[in-house]
Amino acid sequence: MENVYVGIDVSQRKCDASIKDRSHNELVEPIVFEPNMEGIDKLLKVVTEVCKRLKAEPIFGMESTGIYHLPIYAELTALDYTVKVYNPTQINAFSKKSLRKTQTDKIAARTIADALSYEGVPRER
């Protein structure tokens, strides 16, 4: 089964998510959601639709952001999704490989999704 890679840029008040395939194609417009249960449900609705259409399994990735990523991480792992938490230094180093130097929340989410797809399937659950 194929995978789709969901990169999430987490902050205190909002999150941006990018959903990409193995070829780094963005499958839907970036999703903006609040870091609460309603926001996570909004994200999962879109992810579920994409995965159903492509017959794929999602892999989620996010940076460790102190406490802000923890509720999203806890909910996704409780639902038995594969989730990779990156040290921000890893994502910073990965993003330096890009020619694009502008950094926005949407670009950060795309970078995390790309890092997931290059890395392959993480083993953490």
Give the location of each predicted region.
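Phosphate- and other anionic-substrate recognition elements at nucleic-acid/protein interfaces
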Residues: 1-125
